[in-house]
Amino acid sequence: MLSEGYPLCEVSLSELEAVPAEAGTTKALVRGIAARFAALGHSPMAFDAYVTSTVLPGSGLSSSAAFEVLIGVILNHLGSCGLTAPEIAQVGQYAENVYFGKPCGLMDQTASAVGNIIGIDFADPAQPKIQPVAFDFASCGYSLC
């Protein structure tokens, strides 16, 4: 995978054990997501990708969650796995917690995976309740780009 402005990131999907030296890196996220897909009974397929983003890394704008969801969607699609958006979010959270080494929650991944304006109830983190929030920006004089 090549992300614009970053060096090439290559990860062998046949080697899915956590690599402590990769903690905090893109490789850790990719490997962790692939490992979680495998643990869920899927065979992660190799892929090549060129990635660009307007989300600044480390900006507090959920750049890692957006990246995790991207990788999850790629693997889900290529393998015809059938994971739902909340399940892809949970896969991303697992990768970030266990492989990347950051004890994050599930909100950013869920918001990124589901999209739109939503309400999320995490009373049961294994089965978050997600509700769309109807809002008409134009009727309030706003435009969302």
Locate predicted features.
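Anion-binding (especially nucleotide phosphate/pyrophosphate-binding) glycine-rich loop
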Residues: 1-91
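ATP-dependent small-molecule kinase catalytic core of the GHMP/sugar-kinase superfamily
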Residues: 77-145
